[in-house]
Amino acid sequence: MSRRNWINLFSTSQSVELSGDLERGYDAALLIQSLELEYYGDRQIRPELKLSVPRSVQATILRRFKTALSICRSSAAKLSDQRGQLDSQELRQLQLIESIVSRYGSRRSTSSPSISRSPDALPRSLLGVFDSIRLQLDPSTEDSVVAGFRRRRDTTLISLRVLLLLVLVPLLVSQISGTYLISPAVNQFSPELPFLSYPKPLLEEKAAKKLRLYKQELEFDAFLKGVEPLDDAELRNKLTEKATELKHDADEESLKAIKNVFADLAGLIAFAVVCLMSRDELRVLRGFVDEAVYGLSDSAKAFAIILFTDIFVGYHSPEGWSVLLDGVADHFGLPSSQSFVNLFIATFPVVLATIFKYWIFRYLNRVSPSSVATLKGMNGGG
């Protein structure tokens, strides 16, 4: 391997490690915030305070809090010297981690947090301005900025690569295995294995309708041409030939549905394998997506949220869900049940809307409250 390849590999490894540390610390900070909001009335967690929950539950809460706080401290210590390599979104995440660490102070303050502390000599905002000027005049700032650009470039390349793998690998595995492996195997063993030749009432019903339509077409053609209708023997022969053809088509559709099931299973297994083998890259992809989403303006975020909710849980969403369910049923050769479709439409969009509103309340309201305010304004204050 050449020297440049080794440098690129080392840079990519550093980028993945830095993104992983930031993501773990950010998730831990969000966990502490959620514990504060849910159990301590959005106040600081105090181990000596007795909650109105069983002791085992409170012990679990404190254990999760201590673990998350330890992760925040570790991440803050690792990332403090690499602040110049972070972009604006990652800097906001780091600031949240540092605010959690500073709120709970040193390790000794976890068990007995201080009630008061001496005020700062200068406001923190003014100290931040001085620190920003110092960083701009520091000779090593240029190297830090270049390193940050390289890390963001590596993050983008890793995210695009793993995204392509997640999309292309399952599709290619499904198509190739279905064409060259599953299809010949099903054709070979379908006459011998009963479960590959299951009853096909829906396909048989479609074939019967086509046969009746074919009989009516023969009679209609005879009337149009002004000839005598076919006698019973000729009509029976033509209907027998057509019935044989329709039966063959129904068998082919049945086998095609079975092939689709096995091909989709192969694609699902390939997707799971890619996820297991690319766990570090998936964390980088998650950070890349967060940066892209939260980098949007408040109006763009609100527009995307309204568009998503109107498509999947809006007024016209039942028609879309009906088409989707019919397509899935046809893909797997299943009968389309209108009762099941109505039940699904009556329950699933409601559950999806509830989950989405809960996400807005618990997560987006903390990360981007201005987006929530814009969303309420675009929804007419609702």
UniProtKB/Swiss-Prot annotation:
Domain of life: Bacteria
Assigned keywords, A-Z: Cell inner membrane, Cell membrane, Hydrogen ion transport, Ion transport, Membrane, Transmembrane, Transmembrane helix, Transport
Primary location group: membrane
Record localization: Cell inner membrane
GO molecular function: proton transmembrane transporter activity
TM stretches of this protein: 162-182, 257-277, 305-325, 340-360
InterPro entries cross-referenced by the UniProt entry: CemA
HAMAP family registered for this protein in UniProt: CemA_PxcA
Known function: Required for H(+) efflux immediately after light irradiation to form a rapid H(+) concentration gradient across the thylakoid membranes. Together with PxcL, contributes to transient H(+) uptake following dark to light transition.
Family designation: Belongs to the CemA family.
Protein name listed in UniProt: Proton extrusion protein PxcA
Source organism: Synechococcus sp. (strain CC9605)
